[in-house]
Amino acid sequence: MRCLPVFVILLLLIASTPSVNARPKTKDLASFHDNAKRTQHIFWSKRNCCIYENWCCEWI
């Protein structure tokens, strides 16, 4: 019987906690894809440049 008040208090505390949003907050992936495309383009340009002309690799 001594545990009953503690149990009731715990139930009240659990019920009064703020609810948590189940969906994670994520940023829009458009900027991530833009950055990935830009980086891929730079690496691709460097690779093609270095195949034909070595001096231009420093400038890209």
UniProtKB/Swiss-Prot annotation:
GO CC terms of this entry: extracellular region
UniProt keyword annotations, A-Z: Cleavage on pair of basic residues, Disulfide bond, Neurotoxin, Secreted, Signal, Toxin
This protein's name: Conotoxin PnMRCL-022
Source species: Conus pennaceus
Tissue spec. comment: Expressed by the venom duct.
Subcellular location: Secreted
Domain of life assignment: Eukaryota
Residues of the signal peptide: 1-22
GO molecular function: toxin activity
Main location as per UniProt: secreted
Keyword Disulfide bond appears in the UniProt entry: yes
Keyword check for Signal: yes
Propeptide residue intervals: 23-45
Family from the record: Belongs to the conotoxin T superfamily.
